[in-house]
């Protein structure tokens, strides 16, 4: 646990990681849990850029500038927004990341936010699965809790 009350990558690595959104998405914790809220806020603040989400921020080694936003993480943030009752925000995250596919409709692993280019493995099955899961979740009627 990070001193700010959010989760961190590991006991030895205090950085935030977008994969830490999964406990809320999968229902392991309620979205109003203080740790979950702090983690979601940190992901938005530290990892989101121009509508895309990085998995985590890399250190200053030479390859860090070559890393792009991880498209799956943008779909995760859309799902978290929906779970938190922020349907309009969820739609924005979904549409922004859905639009980052190639001409054939295929997603890569990463997206270069600055150069507006697809990066990484093509096609990336995890991103396609995440996009489909997010589309299904966003199309479901709101739950009355």
Residue ranges and their predicted role:
Residues 1-70, 92-126, 130-143:
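Extended glycan-interaction surfaces of carbohydrate-active proteins
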């Amino acid at each position: 646990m990070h001193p700010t009350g959010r989760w961190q990558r590991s006991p030895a690595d205090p950085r935030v990681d977008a994969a830490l959104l999964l406990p809320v998405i999968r229902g392991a914790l309620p979205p109003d849990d203080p740790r979950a809220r702090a983690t979601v806020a940190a992901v938005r603040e530290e990892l989101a850029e121009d509508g895309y989400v990085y998995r985590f921020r890399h250190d200053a080694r030479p390859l860090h500038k070559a890393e792009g936003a991880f498209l799956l993480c943008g779909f995760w943030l859309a799902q978290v927004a929906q779970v938190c009752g922020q349907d309009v925000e969820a739609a924005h995250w979904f549409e922004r990341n859905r639009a980052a596919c190639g001409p054939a409709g295929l997603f890569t692993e990463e997206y270069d936010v600055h150069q507006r280019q697809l990066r990484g493995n093509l096609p990336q099955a995890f991103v396609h699965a995440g996009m489909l899961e997010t589309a299904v979740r966003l199309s479901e009627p709101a739950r009355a809790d």
